[in-house]
Amino acid sequence: SHKVSGGLHGVGVSVVNALSSKLQLTIHRAGQIHEQEYQHGDPQYPLKVVGETSTTGTTVRFWPSGDTFSQTIFNVDILARRLRELSFLNAGVKIVLRDERVNFEHIYAYEGGLSEKSALDIAGLPGKLADCQEKDPALSELYLVEGDSPGGSAKQGRNRKMQAILPLKGKILNVERARFDKMISSQEVGTLITALGCGIGREEYNPDKLRYHKII
Protein backbone atom coordinates (compact mmCIF):
# COMPACT_ATOMS: atom_id res chain seq x y z
CA SER A 1 0.00 0.00 0.00
CA HIS A 2 3.03 2.29 0.27
CA LYS A 3 3.78 3.71 -3.17
CA VAL A 4 6.71 5.97 -2.36
CA SER A 5 8.15 4.70 0.94
CA GLY A 6 8.70 1.62 3.05
CA GLY A 7 5.99 2.83 5.42
CA LEU A 8 8.15 4.22 8.23
CA HIS A 9 9.74 7.61 8.87
CA GLY A 10 13.42 8.06 9.67
CA VAL A 11 14.67 4.67 8.46
CA GLY A 12 15.86 5.60 4.97
CA VAL A 13 18.29 3.27 3.24
CA SER A 14 17.72 0.40 5.69
CA VAL A 15 14.18 -0.10 4.35
CA VAL A 16 15.35 0.25 0.73
CA ASN A 17 18.04 -2.36 1.44
CA ALA A 18 15.52 -4.77 2.96
CA LEU A 19 13.27 -4.46 -0.12
CA SER A 20 16.07 -4.85 -2.68
CA SER A 21 17.76 -7.87 -4.23
CA LYS A 22 20.92 -5.79 -4.57
CA LEU A 23 22.11 -2.44 -3.22
CA GLN A 24 25.39 -0.59 -3.85
CA LEU A 25 26.76 2.31 -1.81
CA THR A 26 29.49 4.62 -3.12
CA ILE A 27 30.62 7.33 -0.69
CA HIS A 28 32.96 10.23 -1.49
CA ARG A 29 34.34 11.56 1.79
CA ALA A 30 37.59 12.92 3.25
CA GLY A 31 39.47 12.45 -0.03
CA GLN A 32 38.57 8.77 -0.38
CA ILE A 33 35.96 6.72 -2.25
CA HIS A 34 34.31 4.08 -0.06
CA GLU A 35 32.17 1.24 -1.40
CA GLN A 36 29.94 -1.51 -0.07
CA GLU A 37 27.44 -3.92 -1.64
CA TYR A 38 24.44 -5.78 -0.20
CA GLN A 39 22.36 -8.65 -1.58
CA HIS A 40 18.92 -9.28 -0.11
CA GLY A 41 19.89 -7.09 2.85
CA ASP A 42 23.15 -8.87 3.67
CA PRO A 43 26.56 -7.14 3.27
CA GLN A 44 28.82 -8.91 0.78
CA TYR A 45 31.99 -7.36 2.20
CA PRO A 46 32.95 -4.66 4.75
CA LEU A 47 33.08 -1.02 3.71
CA LYS A 48 36.29 -0.60 1.70
CA VAL A 49 38.32 2.17 0.08
CA VAL A 50 38.41 1.86 -3.72
CA GLY A 51 40.00 5.16 -4.78
CA GLU A 52 40.65 8.84 -4.16
CA THR A 53 38.34 11.83 -4.71
CA SER A 54 38.21 15.60 -4.40
CA THR A 55 34.41 15.73 -4.02
CA THR A 56 31.87 14.71 -1.40
CA GLY A 57 28.55 12.90 -1.71
CA THR A 58 26.83 9.52 -1.68
CA THR A 59 25.43 7.42 -4.52
CA VAL A 60 22.88 4.70 -3.74
CA ARG A 61 21.95 2.17 -6.44
CA PHE A 62 19.35 -0.48 -5.74
CA TRP A 63 17.45 -3.22 -7.57
CA PRO A 64 13.92 -3.87 -6.20
CA SER A 65 13.42 -7.47 -5.14
CA GLY A 66 11.16 -9.59 -7.33
CA ASP A 67 10.48 -11.73 -4.26
CA THR A 68 8.86 -8.73 -2.55
CA PHE A 69 7.25 -6.84 -5.44
CA SER A 70 5.01 -8.29 -8.14
CA GLN A 71 6.28 -5.55 -10.48
CA THR A 72 9.77 -4.04 -10.41
CA ILE A 73 9.38 -1.46 -13.19
CA PHE A 74 9.64 2.13 -11.93
CA ASN A 75 6.69 4.46 -12.62
CA VAL A 76 8.22 7.81 -13.56
CA ASP A 77 4.94 9.69 -12.91
CA ILE A 78 4.85 8.57 -9.27
CA LEU A 79 8.51 9.49 -8.85
CA ALA A 80 7.95 12.90 -10.45
CA ARG A 81 5.07 13.74 -8.09
CA ARG A 82 7.06 12.68 -5.03
CA LEU A 83 10.19 14.59 -6.05
CA ARG A 84 8.13 17.71 -6.73
CA GLU A 85 6.74 17.51 -3.18
CA LEU A 86 10.24 17.11 -1.76
CA SER A 87 11.49 20.12 -3.72
CA PHE A 88 8.72 22.28 -2.20
CA LEU A 89 9.78 21.18 1.28
CA ASN A 90 13.54 21.61 0.79
CA ALA A 91 14.33 25.11 -0.45
CA GLY A 92 17.60 25.44 -2.36
CA VAL A 93 17.98 21.71 -3.07
CA LYS A 94 18.20 20.63 -6.72
CA ILE A 95 16.67 17.24 -7.53
CA VAL A 96 17.26 15.70 -10.97
CA LEU A 97 14.92 12.98 -12.27
CA ARG A 98 16.36 11.12 -15.25
CA ASP A 99 14.66 8.21 -17.05
CA GLU A 100 17.21 6.70 -19.41
CA ARG A 101 14.59 4.35 -20.86
CA VAL A 102 12.98 7.22 -22.79
CA ASN A 103 15.72 9.89 -22.61
CA PHE A 104 13.68 12.00 -20.15
CA GLU A 105 15.11 14.47 -17.64
CA HIS A 106 13.53 17.04 -15.32
CA ILE A 107 15.08 19.27 -12.65
CA TYR A 108 13.13 20.27 -9.52
CA ALA A 109 14.51 23.31 -7.67
CA TYR A 110 12.57 25.88 -5.64
CA GLU A 111 14.91 28.47 -4.14
CA GLY A 112 12.25 29.94 -1.88
CA GLY A 113 10.54 26.67 -1.05
CA LEU A 114 7.00 27.13 0.16
CA SER A 115 7.36 30.88 0.61
CA GLU A 116 7.23 31.29 -3.19
CA LYS A 117 4.29 28.96 -3.77
CA SER A 118 1.69 31.06 -5.53
CA ALA A 119 -1.13 28.85 -4.24
CA LEU A 120 -0.77 30.43 -0.81
CA ASP A 121 -1.46 34.15 -0.84
CA ILE A 122 -0.34 35.30 2.59
CA ALA A 123 -0.49 39.01 1.82
CA GLY A 124 -3.91 39.45 3.44
CA LEU A 125 -6.81 37.67 5.07
CA PRO A 126 -9.29 35.70 2.92
CA GLY A 127 -12.13 37.77 1.53
CA LYS A 128 -14.84 35.46 2.93
CA LEU A 129 -13.46 35.62 6.46
CA ALA A 130 -15.68 37.62 8.82
CA ASP A 131 -13.02 38.42 11.39
CA CYS A 132 -13.66 39.30 15.01
CA GLN A 133 -12.78 42.57 16.74
CA GLU A 134 -10.69 40.92 19.44
CA LYS A 135 -6.93 40.90 18.71
CA ASP A 136 -5.89 38.61 21.57
CA PRO A 137 -5.72 35.04 20.13
CA ALA A 138 -6.47 33.56 23.56
CA LEU A 139 -9.87 35.29 23.52
CA SER A 140 -10.64 34.76 19.81
CA GLU A 141 -12.70 31.95 18.24
CA LEU A 142 -12.82 30.77 14.62
CA TYR A 143 -15.88 28.92 13.32
CA LEU A 144 -15.45 26.90 10.11
CA VAL A 145 -18.76 26.66 8.25
CA GLU A 146 -19.53 24.56 5.16
CA GLY A 147 -21.04 26.66 2.38
CA ASP A 148 -21.87 30.34 1.88
CA SER A 149 -25.52 30.14 3.01
CA PRO A 150 -24.84 28.67 6.47
CA GLY A 151 -21.90 31.04 6.64
CA GLY A 152 -24.22 34.02 6.17
CA SER A 153 -26.51 32.85 8.96
CA ALA A 154 -23.55 32.25 11.25
CA LYS A 155 -22.20 35.75 10.57
CA GLN A 156 -25.53 37.31 11.57
CA GLY A 157 -25.82 35.35 14.81
CA ARG A 158 -22.21 35.57 15.98
CA ASN A 159 -20.62 37.64 18.71
CA ARG A 160 -18.61 40.06 16.57
CA LYS A 161 -16.25 40.91 19.41
CA MET A 162 -14.71 37.43 19.77
CA GLN A 163 -16.17 35.11 17.08
CA ALA A 164 -14.85 34.93 13.49
CA ILE A 165 -16.61 32.99 10.71
CA LEU A 166 -14.89 31.35 7.72
CA PRO A 167 -17.18 29.69 5.11
CA LEU A 168 -15.54 26.83 3.19
CA LYS A 169 -16.87 25.45 -0.09
CA GLY A 170 -18.06 21.83 0.21
CA LYS A 171 -16.04 19.16 1.96
CA ILE A 172 -12.43 20.19 2.44
CA LEU A 173 -9.60 18.07 0.98
CA ASN A 174 -8.37 15.22 3.21
CA VAL A 175 -4.83 16.57 3.62
CA GLU A 176 -3.66 13.49 5.53
CA ARG A 177 -4.03 11.37 2.39
CA ALA A 178 -3.42 13.97 -0.34
CA ARG A 179 -0.12 14.64 -2.10
CA PHE A 180 1.63 17.74 -0.81
CA ASP A 181 1.49 19.67 -4.09
CA LYS A 182 -2.24 18.93 -4.40
CA MET A 183 -2.80 20.04 -0.82
CA ILE A 184 -1.20 23.46 -1.18
CA SER A 185 -2.89 24.07 -4.55
CA SER A 186 -6.33 23.62 -2.94
CA GLN A 187 -8.07 27.00 -2.63
CA GLU A 188 -9.93 25.98 0.52
CA VAL A 189 -6.78 24.69 2.23
CA GLY A 190 -4.90 27.85 1.24
CA THR A 191 -7.72 29.99 2.63
CA LEU A 192 -7.66 28.09 5.92
CA ILE A 193 -3.86 28.33 6.24
CA THR A 194 -3.98 32.07 5.61
CA ALA A 195 -6.80 32.62 8.12
CA LEU A 196 -5.00 30.71 10.87
CA GLY A 197 -1.89 32.82 10.32
CA CYS A 198 0.79 30.37 11.50
CA GLY A 199 2.09 29.39 8.04
CA ILE A 200 3.05 25.97 6.70
CA GLY A 201 6.28 24.09 6.08
CA ARG A 202 9.46 23.53 8.02
CA GLU A 203 10.78 27.09 7.58
CA GLU A 204 7.51 29.04 7.72
CA TYR A 205 5.36 27.28 10.35
CA ASN A 206 5.15 29.13 13.67
CA PRO A 207 2.38 28.07 16.09
CA ASP A 208 2.95 31.24 18.14
CA LYS A 209 1.38 33.21 15.27
CA LEU A 210 -1.93 31.31 15.45
CA ARG A 211 -4.68 33.95 15.36
CA TYR A 212 -7.35 31.92 17.17
CA HIS A 213 -6.87 29.65 20.17
CA LYS A 214 -10.33 28.13 19.77
CA ILE A 215 -11.32 26.63 16.40
CA ILE A 216 -14.73 25.04 15.89
Swiss-Prot record:
InterPro entries: HATPase_C_sf (IPR036890), Topo_IIA (IPR001241), Topo_IIA-like_dom_sf (IPR013760), Topo_IIA_B (IPR000565), Topo_IIA_B_C (IPR013759), TOPRIM_dom (IPR006171)
GO function terms (MF aspect): ATP binding; DNA binding; DNA topoisomerase type II (double strand cut, ATP-hydrolyzing) activity
Pfam families referenced in this protein's UniProt entry, alphabetically: Toprim
Intracellular or extracellular location(s): Cytoplasm
Bridged cysteine pairs (disulfide): none
Entry annotated with the keyword Nucleotidyltransferase: no
EC number: 5.6.2.2
Assigned GO CC terms: cytoplasm
Every Toprim domain range: 140-216
Name of the protein described by the UniProt record: DNA gyrase subunit B
Species of provenance: Acinetobacter sp. (strain ATCC 33308 / BD413 ErpE27)
